[in-house]
Amino acid sequence: MDIEQARARFRSPDRADYPELQGYTRDEIYKDCFGGGALYLAARMVRTMRLKSGDVVLDLGCGKGETSIFLAHHLGVKVMAVDLWTSATYLNDKFAARGYRDQIVPLNLDITERLPFAAEYFDAIFCMNSFSFYGGNIEFLQHLLKHLKQGGQLCVGSEVLSDEFTPEQLQHPPHVYSFRLSPPNQDVDVFEGDFKKQHTPQWWKDLFAGCGLLQVIDCHELEDADVLYEDYVLYEHEHNIDPFDVEISLQQIEWGWHHKPRKSLFTITSCKR
């Protein structure tokens, strides 16, 4: 499938389903967001959370800070914006320029290491499109949840798979999920480092429920996940953001029409016991 065939077939999200994004331009929804869904996914996530103005929220893997601004703007919460790859200076300048310097604190650190937060400090933890890279085990959940208040919420929204890989696929991954990135990242094993870790919504629900620390409140696959992927691919192409990603995404979408697993999106919200 080429891009012109995609234009003819791909759909656009129904903006009426996302009142949280009323007034947002398409650029504001997608720009500087990492992973599938962008602020459409963030909007779905906050619907499942119980947050009030003044609550302290950890935005885990905040990327370039758009989700932190979204949380601060829509919910009036105080945000600790943490990312491994984005500098705190960049984030601070961005938050200040957008009018949120006193509401969002940026930090550059590795969330898998010892954390500089007090025990039970956060009212909620929010994580969009990064949790699968490091969070798919009980040990990490125990490490992270020390800093969440009892009764506080952990909300994760992420790229996910419709089905688990079969044993045969784990041995011989589908070509659309096993490829090399363009230089200088050509040595990255995308299957081992990303897709193999994504799993299904049920897998994540079982992990959260089985850790003994969380009660799962909501877990569901987005019914318009396919549409959100389609729209973002067209956005990337129109803005010449990442031609390689456009090409591989087109292949993944077309492959998913006829094979499993296909790419999807989900949210899971749980409460600390």
Regions found by a protein language model. Give the residues of each.
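Class I SAM-dependent methyltransferase SAM/SAH-binding core
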Residues: 64-113
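Short alpha-helix
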Residues: 195-212
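A short acidic, Gly/Pro-enriched loop at the edge of an enzyme's catalytic core
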Residues: 115-125
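Conserved class I S-adenosyl-L-methionine
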Residues: 1-49, 66, 155-186
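Conserved Class I S-adenosyl-L-methionine
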Residues: 218-273
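A short SAM/SAH-binding and catalytic strip from SAM-dependent methyltransferases
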Residues: 124-136
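A short glycine-rich, Lys/Arg-flanked "PGG" loop and its adjoining helix->strand segment in the class I
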Residues: 138-153
